[in-house]
Structure formats: C-alpha cells, structure tokens
Amino acid sequence: MTTIPPPLPVEEAAITRSVTTGVPPIISVRDLHRTFEKVQAVRGVSFDILPGQVVGFIGANGSGKTTTMRMMATLDLPTSGSISIGGYDVVGYPREVRQKIGWMPDAFGVYPHMTIFEYLDFYGRSFGFKKADRARRIAEVMEFTDLAPIADRMMDKLSKGMGQRLCLGRTLLHDPDVLILDEPAAGLDPKARVEFKQLIRLLAGEGKTIFISSHILSELGEMCDTMLFIDAGRIVHHGSSESLQHHGGTQILIDVQVSGEPGRLVQWVALNPGVKLIEERKRGARIAFESSEPEALAAQLRKMVLDGVPVTDFHRESRKLEDAFVDILRNV
C-alpha cells in the first residue's frame, strides 16, 4: 500500500487566517507566473481561499483565467510561483492534489459509444474504486444530478444541459473537497442554467469549496460570496460580492420621463456636475449620480422639479456587477 506523504510545510508569511475562524486557506496561490514563449499569460497572481468559500473568477478571453485554473488543476506547470491545495504543492504532489479537487473544464468531451453509467463507471475505475464502492458512488452522483432515470442513455443523445450534469457528476465522483469549475453553465438554455445553479448551491451548502468562472457576472453574484477579477494576467480586484456592488462609489441610476421638450432635461444635466447623462431617450433620459444617502434620490427629483424640469415618471435601477467590472478595468 502506497504511503501518502504529509502536506508540505507552508511558510508562515504565506498563510492568511480568518479573523473569526482561525482556519488556514485550503487554496493558497503565491506570485504565480506562466509564460508561453514571449507571452506572459499569468503575471504575479496571489490569493487565498478559505474552506467552504464560493469564489467567482472573472476575466475576459485572454485574461489568464483559464490558464490559472488549469495550473490549479495540475494540468499545466507554473513558470514560477506556487499553488498549494489542501496543504499539498501542485507541482510536488500532483496525485494528492487530484484526490482533493474536482476539475470541470469548459469543454465537455463526449464518448458516443458509452452510456451515462458506463462513462461514470470508467472514471470510477480510474480513481481506483472497488466494485461495490464504485456502484454506490455512481448511484449517489446520478441521484444528485438527476441522471438516474436515464442511466442507460447513450452520451451522444444527451442535451447540452444533461451533458453538463454528467460532467459535474464525473467531477464529484471521488467526493473532492475543492471544485474548480471553468464556465460550467456556458451554452446552457435558461432552464438548464437555473437547474445548474441550484446544484451549485446544494454543493455549497454541503461545505464544498467552489472556485467557479463565468462571463455572466450577475449569476456569480447570486452564487458567490467572494469575487476575483483578473485582467492581462494580474488580479485587479479581490473582495466580497456585496462590496463589489459599491466599487467606485454608490451610484444611483434612474430613468426619467418628462413632459414637453426632453432637451430641457439634457440641458439641466449639463448644468449639474454631480449628475451624469447615460443615454438620451424619446421622452427623457437615463441619468446617474453618486450618493450613499437614502434621501438622495428624492432630493435630486425635487431639485429637478424646482429647476423647471417637469418629471412625469422615473425608475431606479440597481448598480450591476458588470458596471463595477468595467469601472475596475478602466482604472487598471
């Protein structure tokens, strides 16, 4: 029987602890670099993730997002820097790291001549499960992903949503502590997206540590408690989803309709430096102003009326995560 070596010692400076729990991070990334010939895909990335956190990883195509995730999943080697998962260095102990993580890539390969059960059984064998344990674990993941009723269906007959469920089931087969999910809901229809998000919430409720990427920030805002933004290979933001909503100030965004000539509203905005014109409309405009005061909206509308701008209707919109993302990238 092979003896698993103990986790690598982690330098004291490389550990950040939660003030409330005193728990060391389950994922620790330090000064990570990855260079392909002359292209620096990842440049000095560092972050920590605590056990049980659900972390959203956001970045445009070519930002270094997938490269970072592949290195975390032991599928690529860093040029320099380090990644530790569960106390094991990904370069020194890749086998031990793979036992602790579940990796779900953005592209799902189909084995057309396999059924759902045969596919999961194949991966169960690769993890070294004995027959009884393998059957039990396959039954558990098929029940969780709602694939049990179609266990005998051929893989090439699956919808995109069912295929993603199967890929998630394979990811969960060895019951990993950490899930690394690269664009898991990409290409799914609205119904399948909702169902997939429900599965992620259930896994988070079980205490899994989840590191998930997506281009749809609003979805990550619903699922994640922490956000990481990467741009040009560097981390440009690391904070809670709630704090991200208020990045760059608290913006109040309103759609205003006026009676008479809408040009009067545009002129009024130009004379008030604290107000920004976002978009002109047929009978009004979309405007924005910065304020953290609850009474600010009423005060601004009252000022408009007193200044001779006849407001007939308005609608307030919440600041979107996409707005914060754009603001952050502008200031990089």
Regions inferred by a protein language model and the residue ranges of each:
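ABC transporter nucleotide-binding domain
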Residues: 197-290
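Conserved protein kinase catalytic domain
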Residues: 98, 142, 245, 325-326
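C-terminal coupling/interaction segments
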Residues: 2-9, 292-332
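ABC-family P-loop ATPase nucleotide-binding domain
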Residues: 1-33, 331-332
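ABC transporter nucleotide-binding domains
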Residues: 24-29, 34-232, 236-237
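Hydrophobic alpha-helical segments typical of transmembrane helices
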Residues: 119, 137, 154, 240, ...
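Hydrophobic/anchoring residues in structured secondary elements
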Residues: 59, 277-280, 316
